[in-house]
């Protein structure tokens, strides 16, 4: 096509070549750069339109709407929830007991709260059909406990039992809208991705927000400076916790005015927030007028952490306000559970008793190399003792076992003469070599000896 042919026009808008920046020729047709830009805008709009389901560009998430599925094949039918399908509080706690050691009071509170939450969902479905107008508000949960005591594990286990989508978010990465960091809506995007971009399924899931104490207000006077990662985040979370139609950017990141967003109703999403709240026990102790921490106490056999947990059981909402949470945020967390710190006995049980206990995991790994792994009881107690000294709860257990098992897991897969390996207390305390049992054919004969 000659660029000097002035009679050439765009086949779509009718503009001549002189009126546009570029005219592209096809077989018998022409299109200008303005129409190309318009077509791109239309395609971008339809990418997340419920009436269209085109293939997304490489590297981007698949479109998700209430009317389409994000995976190949027919859409899963919407699951109806009846009261008989919801596990009772006793059943929930029994299931938690198989996976989480201790924390009986917290398990009871969680079992009742989760049972009531999903009973509320079942009621909503039946109420819509019966035309009832009573609306039952949801009860989000606040977990308070030291690091490594099982806050996240409790939430994960609940989601596994209920077979609902579960997402974990870190509150420390969140900032107020307009500032560097993540918007609070990105929490919902994680839940949506776990649900395979099925909005209906995501809207009945569970979100666990960890390190919630890190968004406490930095100053008692909110007017001194703008607290974009503290009070600002709390304000941004309020509507989401209570229940709202949130606009979620489908590819994450910041929202902008010309972006199509996915709408998610958070009214039926259960939010569980957890944090260590270091120093909160001092505020409670001061309010009670007692000096239990650091002085001779009637329960002097307890550790400092155990005494702190006992004081936290007398916590009131005003203590959380003084810690830095705003009253509106606390009001949307009506269920508060305090978790106990793990002592040596609990750490010993964690190593062996749960279904997926750490000792069982390493025994399974070594069994795949045809080696039977045995942990002596005194070795298990020594591991628990060392983990207790590290003051990081159950998280320390895996690190210690990894240190102990490093040489074993490095050497034994290459040896065909070992059938049994024993971990002893000396190996834990001195990092000495493990006791191994050789095959009879590999044992030295008296003559060779």
From Swiss-Prot:
Q: Which UniProt keywords apply?
A: ATP-binding, Chaperone, Metal-binding, Nucleotide-binding, Zinc
Q: Which domain of life is it from?
A: Bacteria
| Disulfide partners | none
Q: Name one GO cellular component term.
A: HslUV protease complex
Q: InterPro entries in the record, alphabetically?
A: AAA+_ATPase, ATP-dep_Clp_protease_ClpX, ATPase_AAA_core, Clp_ATPase_C, Clp_protease_ATP-bd_su_ClpX, ClpX_bact, P-loop_NTPase, Znf_CppX_C4
**Which residues make up the binding site for ATP?**
146-153
The family note in this entry says: Belongs to the ClpX chaperone family.
PANTHER family recorded: ATP-DEPENDENT CLP PROTEASE ATP-BINDING SUBUNIT CLPX-LIKE, MITOCHONDRIAL (PTHR48102:SF7), ATP-DEPENDENT CLP PROTEASE ATP-BINDING SUBUNIT CLPX-LIKE, MITOCHONDRIAL-RELATED (PTHR48102)
Q: What is this protein called?
A: ATP-dependent Clp protease ATP-binding subunit ClpX
Protein encoded by which gene = clpX
